[in-house]
Amino acid sequence: MSDEVLCAIDGGVATVTLNRPGQRNAMNTALLAALRARFDELDGNRDVRVVVVRGAGPAFCSGMDLKEMEARGGAQGADPESGVIEVLGRVERSRHPTVAVVHGDAIAGGCELALHCDLRVAADVARFGMPLARIGLVVPFVLGQKLLEIIGPAHTRHLLFTGQPIDARRAHEIGMVHQVVPAGELEAATQQLAQSIARNAPLALAGIKATIQRAISLRESIAHADLDEVTGRARRSADASEGRRAMLEKRRPVFRGE
């Protein structure tokens, strides 16, 4: 299987690691396919009780791979959000409880990956952000719903309208993160949490997860085709192209409302 996503199992705890450290674990096509395959594989493993998701290198995940997106046609290319949404949904539907361990930046799709896990533990130096407006993009409806579900309308507005990242302490204050620990204690805190889950009855864990998922799935019944079109128009806009180029070129974008 692809080295883009690694997996190790020990004592009922499966650790899934995004493994593109040189690209800050940006979500390219290969990583998304490997992540989906890992979760498919783990769902059939009866020895697994809990899945820990983490990133190699300095970042948890920096979101979509903008370089690949530009290479595939930029604003006129295939819809990149659909692939991310599909894989995030697969993570959320995992048969096992999932824990995101965020040691560095979790930005855009990386933030959403953490949110699509059941629990989140963060180092005090971690940051979370949804800077889509800063590159001319609109958050897809289903991902916006996940933010609303976890941090509520007021904090969702602030996070999306400003596009500014928040630190781990603030993320904990608004309910985005369950636990914040010093960076040097993150591994021990993760193991303690994972083992506290893993020693519980497997059928009970699966049943609890299924019950929660059924309640969450109600959001999928909301019609949002019109909002998907809004998202698509923004992605295809000149401003979005300018935003992506500016980020890759490490400069301030010049938006024209076009």
Predicted feature residues:
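Conserved CoA-thioester-binding segment of acyl-CoA-metabolizing enzymes
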Residues: 1-56, 89
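Terminal peptide-recognition signature
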Residues: 16, 20, 35, 53, ...
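Crotonase-fold acyl-CoA enzyme core
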Residues: 89-205, 222, 236-237, 241-242, ...
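Helix-loop "lid/cap" segments that line or gate small-molecule binding pockets
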Residues: 159-160, 211, 215, 229-235
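Terminal low-complexity tails and localization/encapsulation signals of metabolic enzymes
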Residues: 2, 245-258
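Glycine- (often His-adjacent) and acidic-residue-rich active-site loop
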Residues: 55-93, 106, 136, 219
